[in-house]
């Protein structure tokens, strides 16, 4: 899912329950005709829980009815389930834990890391200004794009911010 790396890179995650679809909100005064469905909210919540960075989950604009309360409980349960299944992956130089891929695209090298444990992907973002590096969560599709000489949008946005 394309949202997974975004959730994996978030410190704070908030869900506005008015973003749920009418059918999911169980309250015609809440919700949106094109809102997200409860399954997606639970999946996103689990991704947030699995993130090593996420330290806050907030649910906002709550409806006061029994069915909605059950949904909020499920969203929180999925977050806690994700926290329970967190894998601390931070030593990217450990060849026992990560595969390192260097891809040449349009005259620049992009370095990717893939966890041998979780099979999740990261890109190295080199910040030459302060001589430090950060690791940006990404998808295998970003790696495949780079192999086809297409610089991943995620990498471009991250390096533009640096």
Residue map of PLM features:
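Catalytic cores of soluble, metal-dependent hydrolases
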Residues: 1-162
């Amino acid at each position: 899912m394309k949202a997974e790396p975004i959730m994996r890179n978030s410190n704070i995650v908030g869900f506005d329950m008015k973003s749920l679809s009418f059918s999911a909100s169980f309250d015609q005064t809440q919700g949106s005709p094109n809102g997200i469905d409860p399954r997606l909210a639970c999946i996103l919540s689990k991704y947030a829980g699995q993130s090593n960075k996420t330290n806050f989950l907030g649910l906002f604009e709550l409806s006061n009815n029994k069915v909605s309360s059950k949904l909020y409980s499920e969203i929180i349960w999925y977050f806690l389930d994700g926290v329970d299944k967190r894998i601390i992956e931070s030593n990217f130089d450990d060849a026992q834990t990560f595969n390192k891929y260097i891809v040449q695209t349009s005259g620049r090298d992009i370095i990717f890391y893939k966890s041998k444990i979780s099979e999740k992907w990261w890109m190295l973002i080199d910040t030459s200004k302060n001589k430090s590096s950060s690791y940006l969560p990404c998808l295998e599709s970003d790696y495949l794009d780079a192999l086809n000489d297409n610089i991943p949008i995620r990498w471009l946005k991250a390096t533009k911010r640096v």
